[in-house]
Each structure stands twice: as C-alpha cells, then as structure tokens.
Amino acid sequence: MGASVGATSDQEWGHVPVMVEEVLLYLAPRSGGLYIDATVGLGGHTQAILSRSAPDGRVLAIDADAQALAIAERRLSDDGGRVTFVQGRHRDLERIAVAQGFSGCQGILLDLGVSSLQLDDAERGFSFREAGPLDMRMDSEAPVSAEEVVNHWPEQELARVIAAYGEERYARRVAHRIVQARPIRDTAHLAAVVSGAVRSSGGIHPATRTFQAIRIAVNDELGSLEAVMPQALALLAPGGVMAVIAFHSLEDRIVKQFMVRESRGCLCPPRIPVCECGHRVQLDRLTRRPVQASTGEIGRNP
C-alpha cells in the first residue's frame, strides 16, 4: 500500500481511512479551497479534509457504490452544506466535476482500495471467506458481474484475466478448473475450486489473486484509473495537488508511468533531434517515490 502525489479514525462507523495523515500533509486543505474525493467510500478522508479546510472549504464526494455513498452522506450530515455527494464512476470525473462547479481545484484524492463495507458484506461477493453471490460490482447497476466472468467467459480469456490482473502464475490451471466446475454457485464454491488448483503460499489464501483479478475485470479498474488521471490533472488549479493511494503493483505502475510522463517535456525518442510531439510539463512530482504506509498504518489497515 502506498501513495503517489503530484504537485481520522471513526470507531462508531468501524472505518479507518487509509494514510489520512499523509493525505492531509500533501493536499494541505485550507479554508476556501475546492477539493474532490473521487472515491469517497465511507467518507473518512472527506471528513478529515472538511475539518482541515473549515470554515468554508468545499468537497465534491464521488463514489460508484450507492450503499457506501449513502453512509458517507449520513455520517457527514452536519457538514454545513460544504459537501456535494454524487454517485458516479471516477472515470467520469471531469464531466461530474464541471457539472457541480468543481474546476480549478486545490486538491484531488483517489483511494483505489476496496472498502471494508464491501469486503465485510458477503452479499456483495467480494470476499472468499464467506459464501455470497458472484457479484463484485462496485456499482450494483453495472451490467457485468463476477457471475458472467466466472461462468460464461471463455477459458482462454479467463486465464488471461487471472494472469494479467491477479499476477497468478497458475492462471491457466485455475481457469481450466473453473471451467470444469461450471456452473460455479457462489464465492465459497469459487474459492474452493481455486484452492484445489493453487497451493497456499506465504500465508496468503490461494484464492486471493484470482478474486482480485475477477474484481478488477468486473469493474474495469485499471481502465478507469488510466481514464481518470488526465481528467484529474485538467481539473486542478495551478499549484493544485493530486494524490493517489494504490494497493497493488498494477495500480502503482499505471500511476507512476502517468506521473513520470506528465512531469517531462518532450517525449520524442532520442533519435529525433527536434521535438515533434509538442508535449509540455504538466505537473511536478512532489515525491520521487511512492509514500509507503507506516508499520502502524499497516497494523490498523492490514
């Protein structure tokens, strides 16, 4: 778990926002500022930004998950009208933000993790620890669920997804076992099938990588990440800050490549003596390397 940056726990809700102190350090919220939490979840980061930007900083809080958004809205109901809540995908960030009057922002946050609300509710289908429907959709209205991927996608495509998005070395074996066991009934059945194909390693559940891969495919998480970062950059005021909290190497790679590219001028190959691309520096990287979660943070958010 780490955060890349360019130029409070709440026991009542059982929610501990990830790396909140680091987020506040780099976003440096101030009164009068405009901020976007593009993945608000249960609202922990938004709450901290509101507190730091009082009395009149404003936050646009976006999430694809209607259940999480409703909880965030309830817990922040005394915000004095400083938060605007919108259900939507962060890949549509620019359209949503402009419609709500949030351009020229001082800070934008993307927390790419799956929330405890989603993991703890077996009915959402994210967890392999309890039986639940094969769902895994962040947006319950989205057309593709895990059931479609697991029970209907061709074996070759399933293997590709598990290898690419789960970095599972036994992807072809796992995909073959899944196809053989169809129809897969629920998440417990899927976890058992995968566990029969993959040995446990390093204390990690054998189904961890496969579940991650299917979730990423269902929600097009990497495509959404690639789509949202240029939009976030376009919405920042001069001197504004974008912070991204990533949880695995696939996300981290996309974020790093974007920030490195946009912190450079000409992107033409060295063999071309005069710039033809016209690319200009778009941001300053505030950290050369991702900010890693502290040991205490990992203990609070394992």
Model-predicted regions and their roles:
Residues 1-302:
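S-adenosyl-L-methionine-dependent methyltransferase catalytic core, i.e., the SAM/SAH-binding region
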